[in-house]
């Protein structure tokens, strides 16, 4: 498997973008190698993502306290209502800035998830697992 790491540097922080094929099997190694740790995570999942894929991620994250929100990633759901639902879950489950939101799906899933992660408590950790070429 070919894997590339791209270092993104901004004025306030820097982070890695990992690009490759079938990286899911190496998810825990990638998290460890990039010093990404968290106790709780919210998985935001496009309902078109195959169950086999989701089961693999759930298995890999079995030791984590995780919650799931699955939705139809259509333009109509790229909305404040969806963002409010995600924020409500994060609040009710007592997420902290050290916890994580993981997006699994296409562009709409990534857009809604990344925005939510950026505004919750001034930003929580965000991992995007794109399942479409356009979402990358």
What label would you give each PLM region?
Residues 1-100:
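ATP/NTP phosphate-donor binding region
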Residues 78-136:
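Glycine/threonine-rich beta-strand-loop-alpha-helix active-site module
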